[in-house]
Amino acid sequence: MIELHSSPTPNGQKVMIMLEETGLEWKHFDVNIRLGEQFTPEYLKLSPNNKIPAIVDTDGPGGGPYRMMESGAILFYLAEKTGKFLPKDARKRYDTMQWLIFQMAHIGPMFGQANHFNNYAKDNIQYAKDRYNNESIRLYRVLDNQLSTNAWIAGDEYTIADMAIYPWTKGHKDRGIDKAGYPNFMRWFEAMQARPAVQRNNKMADEIRARMAKAAEGKTPIDMFNTQDNAARLSRATGH
């Protein structure tokens, strides 16, 4: 059994897709980051960096429970555990790892900052908006170029690299990404949307959001983007 302690953000969804694709038995444990549940002492035992997602594999290496944080590492772990979606061929395997790390190092940080400055920042900082929006568009071009000669992100096989990138690209329309300018990306995105596991993920993500919203009724949300407050929350939770 895989326990997924998470929220339906892009990083949470990439693991949900992998779990659905592999057919592993799993259960979602809601972590409402808007309420600060990622700072509870219990959750920090799973993810010391107070980020989602985290997993507990009740049948981990050696047969006992094993916990893990960081979505990219979790994808790699689940691929190793099941022997699925990470090619055995050395070149294809390294290609997959390159593009998985590309998502972690570039798409996640840049798309996340664009979303923050477009939708959540208290100050309207045009420089920040331009920087992150333009870099996001550049990254879509990188994807489109890569997909011009490959069926999937890392080559001719569907892999964890595709699962990692897809949830981050659901908002492509907000960046003006369309078939006319990015035909290869759009072909890939539609292929992802057609996968049953991805469709199940999208449905579950909506259900989890609704469940979390209902559970949060009457409660005061935290300011997730106040880094000083977040440091204080972490200190209080850990006693350091």
Residue ranges, per PLM feature:
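Short, hydrophobic secondary-structure boundary micro-motifs
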Residues: L86-K88, M110-Q113, A151-D156, Q199-K203
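Solvent-exposed, charged/polar functional surfaces in cytosolic regulatory/catalytic domains
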Residues: E135-R138, V142-Q146, A191
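Residue-level signal for nonpolar/aromatic packing positions in well-ordered secondary structure
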Residues: I55, I74, L143, D162, ...
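Active-site-flanking alpha-helical
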Residues: A79, W168-T169, N202
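GST superfamily/GST-like fold recognition
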Residues: H106, M110-N115, I153-G181, M186-A194, ...
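GST-like domain detector, emphasizing the conserved glutathione-binding G-site
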Residues: M1-D130, N134, D144, A232-H240
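Acidic/histidine-enriched, glycine/proline-rich intrinsically disordered or flexible terminal extensions
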Residues: A205-H240
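Cytochrome P450 catalytic-domain "roof"
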Residues: I52, Q146-I153
